[in-house]
C-alpha cells in the first residue's frame, strides 16, 4: 500500500508504538507519527525532535514500552502520553551519551537492546543499553580492533540480528566490504553472563574469510 498523504515526509526508519507508527525523517532532524491506528494518515503538526543534545537521528527502537530515539552520538527516550497533538514526550533524565553508527545495527536482546555505535569522537564498538541513562560496552578489544578496519561508510551499512539455540542467546553483527574480507561477529549473551566476561566468536560462509549467509 502506498502512502499518499501530503503530510508524510521521506523516512528512513519506522516503529510501531502504542497504536502509532513512528517515523524518523531521512534528514535525521525530526520524528513524526501517524494518526492513532491509521498508518496511512498523518497530521503535519504531529512531529517532534530529540532535544537534549540534538544530533542527527540515526535509528529507533521500542523496548519496555518506551521509544528510544538514537542519534549519531546520543540517545533520548520517549513515552506515549496521549492527549491532543503530538503524543510522545521525552522522559526526564532518560538520556545516554552514546549513539548509533548504523541504522540497521540495533537489536532487542536479553531484556534490553544492543547497538553498533559510540559517543562523541569515539570509535565504533558494540554496546548494551543497561538502563535509560547508561550504555555498557560489550565488544572486547579484539572485536573493536577488527571493526576499526572498516570505513565509516561500510560501518553505516552494518546490520544485526539475534537468535536463541539450546537455551543460549546470541546477537550477530555483520560488516560487509568490497575492500577487505567481510566479517560476522557473534556475541554469546548467556556465556557472557555466566563467565562475567564478554564471549565472542565468528561465523563464516565458505572456507575463506567471508561474512555469514543465513
Positions of PLM-derived features:
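Charged/polar interaction segments and conserved charged motifs
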Residues: 8-36
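Blade/loop signatures of beta-propeller domains
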Residues: 25-41, 77-85
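Helix-loop-helix junctions within predominantly alpha-helical proteins
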Residues: 48-50
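Catalytic phosphate/metal-binding cores of nucleic-acid and nucleotide-processing enzymes, i.e., regions
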Residues: 45
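Beta-sheet-dominated scaffold domains
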Residues: 3-7, 14-20, 53-214
Amino acid at each position: 500500500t502506498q502512502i499518499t498523504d501530503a503530510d508524510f515526509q521521506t523516512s528512513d526508519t519506522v516503529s510501531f508504538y502504542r497504536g502509532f507508527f513512528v517515523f524518523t525523517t531521512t534528514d535525521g532532524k525530526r520524528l513524526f507519527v501517524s494518526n492513532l491506528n491509521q498508518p496511512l494518515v498523518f497530521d503535519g503538526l504531529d512531529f517532534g525532535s530529540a532535544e537534549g543534545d540534538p544530533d542527527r537521528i540515526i535509528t529507533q527502537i521500542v523496548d519496555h514500552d518506551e521509544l528510544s530515539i538514537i542519534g549519531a552520538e546520543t540517545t533520548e527516550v520517549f513515552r506515549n502520553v496521549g492527549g491532543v497533538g503530538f503524543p510522545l514526550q521525552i522522559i526526564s533524565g532518560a538520556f545516554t551519551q552514546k549513539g548509533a553508527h548504523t541504522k540497521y545495527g540495533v537489536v532487542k536482546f536479553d531484556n534490553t537492546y544492543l547497538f553498533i555505535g559510540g559517543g562523541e569522537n569515539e570509535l565504533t564498538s558494540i554496546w548494551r543499553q543497561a538502563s535509560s541513562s547508561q550504555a555498557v560496552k560489550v565488544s572486547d578489544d579484539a572485536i573493536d580492533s577488527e571493526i576499526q578496519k572498516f570505513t565509516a561508510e561500510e560501518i553505516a551499512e552494518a546490520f544485526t540480528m539475534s537468535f536463541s539455540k539450546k537455551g543460549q542467546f546470541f546477537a550477530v553483527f555483520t560488516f560487509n566490504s568490497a575492500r577487505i574480507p567481510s566479517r560476522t561477529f557473534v556475541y554469546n549473551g548467556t556465556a557472557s553472563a555466566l563467565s562475567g566476561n564478554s564471549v565472542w566468536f565468528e561465523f563464516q560462509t565458505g572456507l575463506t574469510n567471508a561474512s555469514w549467509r543465513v
